[in-house]
Amino acid sequence: MNTKFASKAPKTNKVAKADAELAEVLKPGQSDELLKELHILTREGRLNQDSRRKLKQVYHLFQFIEQLLRELPEEGAGATLADHGAGKSYLGFIIYDLFFRARQGGHVYGIETRGELVERSRALAQRLGFGRMSFLNLTVAESAKASELPAQIDVVTALHACDTATDDAIAFGLAKKARCMVLVPCCQAEVAACLRET
């Protein structure tokens, strides 16, 4: 018996709506593969509420950073960016994907003290072919003097820099003569709550 199956079932309204919402959220040119690797998108290419919040936050920061990069000589074609306290490197990967990937030059450095996160990020960059990304297992003091980093860094970022990490990122930026620093301390919500109580 010869039975033919339809190659694709028609999209349900729910799936079509989810696809439309995803298209609204994602930036043009954003790699779905990267977002799946970062677990921002599910294997099926869907976005859950927690991931939506994280992505919105990173995209918001990217808008500021992209503008700063474009103001550099040659619109940031050879820019260097160091992401301090990179963690899982969401910010660094998304900046690379949306800004650096299409350019011939420039480099993103992820600086992190947790070795397992550095190794994971290195492996992901290699899998994705992001050849101008480096991940360094260094402290702030070490990174300011490290030979793996250029003498001058154009942009320093630190997203959710805990405890003294914001101060450390500022010290690094000053040591590396950074043109710009984009820093987001993690405790701002705690401080705001304390201020409301007083």
Where are these regions (language model features)?
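Phosphate-coordination loops involved in phosphoryl transfer and adenosine-cofactor binding
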Residues: 78, 105, 153
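Conserved alpha-helix/loop element of class I SAM-dependent methyltransferases that forms part
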Residues: 57-77
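Conserved SAM-binding motif I beta-strand of class I
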Residues: 107-112
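Conserved SAM-binding loop of SAM-dependent methyltransferases across substrates and taxa
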Residues: 88-103
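Class I S-adenosyl-L-methionine
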Residues: 1-36, 44, 51, 63, ...
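Phosphate/oxyanion-binding active-site loops and adjacent basic polyanion-contact surfaces
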Residues: 53-60, 87-91, 113-117
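Conserved class I S-adenosyl-L-methionine
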Residues: 76-87
